[in-house]
Amino acid sequence: MKRTDYINWDEYFMGIAILAAKRSKDPNTQVGACIVSQDNIIISTGYNGMPKGCSDDEFPWDRRGNTDADTKYPYVVHAELNAILNANGRDLRGSRIYVALFPCNECAKAIIQSGIKEVVYLSDKYADTMMNLVSKRMLDAAGVRYTRLNTDIGSLTLDFVAEENIKK
């Protein structure tokens, strides 16, 4: 008889996005994204971080500074955009993107332009901000669905064990 306590596809792909977020060097906000084809094949992942070639040690991670250039905001590439760029030109039309935090307006534009048709997210903590409302307006106009993932899973544990310890 097969197991019945396995996670569903949405939980699996959101788990991949959350795991990708663990790669972020941002001390305040770690976001990951996972792009999935219509037939549940992972196309790409990404997380928020500095652009390739820009040292994580030489660019600021601060939220506040003397000028905007002294903050992380003009430099950091968001998880959604990194996942789209990491797809390296693969066709994303009709795909889904899983992301822990609802996309900002800039990421919403990239999602729309790339042909992604659904956003699955966990948190909408900036729901009342103008930029979040702008994101939703654009996604609605472009016919991109967005759905908050409702799950009763509080957490998942990754066990790194030697192969000989895995149940057969």
Question: What are the residue ranges of the model-derived segments?
Answer:
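Zinc-dependent deaminase catalytic domain
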Residues: 1-168
